[in-house]
């Protein structure tokens, strides 16, 4: 039996004139693992939403053609029946959590299956153990980091024992260690015969764990190949804006059709890009934050040089987001004790200022940015932000829309856009305000390589105009390409700092993986990757 059978599919959202995706034929065999990739907004999420029944049962859209999952007609089968066979991890795990604590969330789906209490407990305990969250069982959902929340939702899905899993960017919000753990689980799922669809931008990372690669471009399947053919298609995939590493292009140029690591280690060289040093101190912060029980979550100092891009990396739960929230004045002082909060921006002491005043000096983009949207159109959202900060004019609005490739979406509701597009709306809104120091929490999460490069180039332009930027990210290739400095945080402290190539040499001990080019190009010896 096939996992997926699609024939003559067209999906058109309400209010749209043309289909968002058109697929003449697509088959996925039972037990097969498939990577679906493509640029943000290309139609990937629409395709998987048809496979799991979200379209048309939860999202109102017109479907033409035939879609079958394990033999069931998706259009006529209730979604609760489809969910018994197909489990899904959504792109933004925050939208998938409904309960107060972790154990309640993991048990929620299984409870609806009306199985015995003993079996339910067994499934819940097994799932929490597999995902490493057993010790967090009584934690409140709203206190979890992005990675912890993602593991919780995955555990909830796994507890329902589906025949197939759809993982919509499962590594987008987690650190390298978490990525390795999830991919090891993918390996386990494959060995157990579970059918898998992974929607991912990180082609390089998931390649060993899939059988096929499907590329969606402008609502159509542009490429459908076995994974062994990826080097042969490297140039074309790169032209589509996908994250094809430099060493794959090097192999293609030298006549290879498959990846040959032995050849690469003998012949491939890599040199990091040039960086600037910066002059003067744009931001200094000394922060100490502890729980009501006296456990320090943050105990560190941070300094950003004027007119530079600094990346902040670290494991999930290391304190990166908490540090940013203290600096911008968003920390919950009823839940946590702020022992020290010294913040100086461009010589101005903001330590005792309120949130509104601090916001004139520091712009902040949170990790889960959908909560920022309060207007019905992209244009009005950015306009509202600019007016609040006294920076609005029509010409500037147009420039911001074009800068973030949003001009074509100016009349769209931000909440109906893809995650990558929504993130660009949030970034445009924050950066349109005029603050000279910008803190961004995971702006690369969920973005394809094409738009990450656009983001990086925009940050370089802002840097060259005198802006100082701090970017929290797990994306080491983005850091290597665009950051001037790299800070590594562990257990609430900055433990490494310097230029990325200096820090990457020492970063593995703190769970930070350099781009593979560093090892293949001889910048880091093989034993560092053991």
From Swiss-Prot:
Any one Gene Ontology MF annotation carried by this entry is: ATP binding
Biological process annotations from GO: transmembrane transport
Q: Does the keyword Phosphoprotein apply?
A: no
- Disulfide cross-links: none
* Location, primary (coarse class): membrane
Segments traversing the membrane: none
Domain of life per record: Archaea
List localization entries: Cell membrane
The GO cellular component terms are: plasma membrane
Q: Which residues bind ATP 1?
A: 38-45
Which InterPro entries is this protein grouped with? AAA+_ATPase, ABC_transporter-like_ATP-bd, ABC_transpr_CbiO/EcfA_su, ECF_ABC_transporter_ATP-bd, P-loop_NTPase
Q: Which UniProt keywords apply?
A: ATP-binding, Cell membrane, Membrane, Nucleotide-binding, Repeat, Translocase, Transport
Q: Please list the residue ranges annotated as the ABC transporter domain.
A: 6-243, 282-516
User: Binding positions for ATP 2?
Assistant: 314-321
**Could you tell me the EC number(s) of this protein?**
7.-.-.-
Q: What does this protein do?
A: Probably part of an ABC transporter complex. Responsible for energy coupling to the transport system.
* Family membership: Belongs to the ABC transporter superfamily.
Which protein, by its recorded name, is this? Putative ABC transporter ATP-binding protein SSO2030
Organism listed in the record? Saccharolobus solfataricus (strain ATCC 35092 / DSM 1617 / JCM 11322 / P2)
Task: Tell me the classification of the organism that encodes this protein.
Answer: Archaea, Thermoproteota, Thermoprotei, Sulfolobales, Sulfolobaceae
